[in-house]
Amino acid sequence: MFRDKREVSSIRADWLELICRLDENMKSFDSTSEINKIRQQITEQCRQAGSRKTGIYRLSVPTGGGKTLASLNFALHHALETGKRRIIYVIPYLSITSQTVATFRNMLGLDADSNIVLEHYSTAGLQNSSNTGSAGTSEEENARERQRKLASERWIIRLL
């Protein structure tokens, strides 16, 4: 079923550390504008909802209302409170997937090679796969690409 039978250890994420990073980065936002005050209220409600039991929740907020970071706050707090091993973040449109992943990485202080966030969808990584093993591609880049492929096959990353 898997292309590569090598063992890949599961990656551990420290939810509390990620929450602290997110909180620290969110402090830099302008708290005086009306829209940011509303975004902060939405985020705080999501953060508090993170302590609820596991279930299906809906976040209905207009465009520009801060859904991306509010829902990440919920997910991280919920994972911490309920002992979840991973977060699976489902987005309805491919067009916003890369943007959301970039926001997550930026706000959590993670680089593109981080093993905490995995961007997994039908075309993820295809831009790199044609270069794998070609001249000009370093062994380190090839190793990172193999690791990304294994992670996507086995979902060993904590924030998908």
Where are these regions (language model features)?
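N-terminal helicase ATP-binding lobe
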Residues: 1-160
